[in-house]
Regions:
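Generic structural signal for hydrophobic residues
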Residues: 2-6, 124, 233, 270
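Broad structural signal for hydrophobic residues in well-ordered alpha-helices, predominantly aliphatic
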Residues: 6, 10, 33-34, 128, ...
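Short glycine-rich or small-residue beta-strand-to-loop segments that form or flank ligand, phosphate
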Residues: 17-23, 219, 255-260
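Conserved PLP-enzyme active-site core in the AAT-like
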Residues: 24-224, 228-229, 234-237, 241-245, ...
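Residue-level recognition of short, structured coil/turn motifs
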Residues: 11, 15, 132-133, 242, ...
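Conserved C-terminal alpha-helix-loop-beta "cap" of PLP-dependent enzymes
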Residues: 238-355
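Conserved N-terminal alpha-helix of the aminotransferase class I/II PLP-enzyme fold
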Residues: 1-29
Length: 355
């Protein structure tokens, strides 16, 4: 395929792995990569603190049938230091002979820590490999693709996992996730996905490859619009006195903008504004609910053409302190701007801010 060959020219060390076309989202891709490369008796280490909520059941932090823990894979984590930097002493102490794989979540998820740059990730990978040369370093690259000049595979990552209904799909990919990196690791993922001995040699493409490649072609422009929208969001809410992560003048590492709103009511008003600006289901009123995979109610605003797409205008967050909402996406800068202005209008109507 010319498209795949072109990617390999751009990223010479990159082995394009599983590109799953069914209803496949990043948690599935991460579970696949972990399950394929961890065996009973191995240990998984997170040197960046707790994983994203939906991975807790995959790992077994919260009990769930089929988790890694159920299959004899242990887990430990090293929390970040109070300033958000890596605890290198703690990481060194945590790595031992059973530590098989290190998982690095680039984006903040539902936390208010800064997201990590490719350069920071590269330094962490080098440190981990200095402690144990054969350790596998995997990066959850969701929301970070194309935001910086470098990607995790440029700075030593053995395996990178992400979603096609986020940055790389450019808003056109209707579904899909990806795993890429070192050939032997990707082969194991392919065997896990289909069957040993079959790997990537089987599977229907369902006529979706054109959408994937066209989305990838447009992705740099779409991601740029999304980043611009995030900066605008930070500037607006920063000026109103809310804490925003990152700040409006900080360097961007991903497309997510966190805004600490301080109350359930403010989160709901914000999300109602985003939903009202949506091209699909703008008449719907988002409400918090017990979403599978989360330990608290979650509110989501996403009137998107592709269900679950977070490169399209969207906002969400768990209903818990510090009541932070996470804004991302916008296929065009103008739509992102409209969404934020609508969120401000709903906040004003609810008597939560004064302009």
């Amino acid at each position: 395929m010319p498209g795949v060959k072109g990617l390999k020219v751009l990223r010479p060390g990159l082995h394009l792995g599983t590109l799953k076309k069914n209803r496949f989202e990043p948690t599935h891709a991460l579970a696949l990569a972990l399950g394929a490369n961890l065996l009973p008796g191995d240990e998984l280490l997170s040197p960046v603190g707790a994983p994203y909520d939906t991975l807790e059941e995959v790992i077994g932090i919260r009990p769930s049938p089929g988790s890694l823990r159920e299959y004899g894979v242990s887990y430990r984590q090293v929390d970040l230091l109070p300033d958000g930097s890596f605890d290198y002493d703690g990481i060194r102490a945590a790595i031992h002979e059973k530590t098989k794989l290190v998982t690095i979540q680039r984006s903040k998820g539902y936390a208010t820590r800064p997201s990590f740059s490719a350069e920071e990730i590269g330094k962490l990978i080098a440190f981990c490999k200095n402690c144990k040369p054969d350790i596998i370093c995997m990066v959850d690259n969701c929301y970070g693709e194309l935001v910086e000049r470098q990607e995790p595979t440029d700075v030593g990552a053995d395996m990178v996992v992400g979603s096609l209904i986020k940055n790389l799909g450019g808003g056109l990919a209707p579904t899909g996730g990806y795993v890429c990196g070192r050939q032997d690791l990707i082969d194991r993922c392919a065997y896990r996905l289909s069957a040993p001995g079959l790997g990537k040699e089987v599977g229907a493409n369902l006529g979706l490859l054109t959408s994937f490649y066209q989305g990838l072609f447009l992705a740099p422009t779409v991601v740029a619009s999304s980043v611009k929208g995030a900066i605008f969001t930070a500037g607006c809410y920063e000026a109103l006195g809310f804490r925003v992560v990152p700040g409006s003048r900080e360097v961007r590492r991903d497309i997510i903008q966190a805004v600490e709103l301080g109350s359930r009511e403010a989160m709901c008003a914000f999300c109602k504004g985003i939903q009202a600006a949506a091209p699909v289901d703008s008449y719907v009123t988002p409400e918090p609910w017990a979403m599978p995979g989360y330990d608290s109610d979650v509110i989501m605003a996403a009137g998107a053409f592709v269900q679950g797409s977070s490169i399209e205008l969207s906002a969400d967050g768990p209903i818990r302190e510090p009541y932070a909402v996470y804004f991302q996406g916008g296929l065009t800068w103008y739509h992102a701007k409209l969404g934020i202005l609508m969120s401000l209008q709903k906040m004003v109507e609810a008597g939560l801010v004064n302009l």
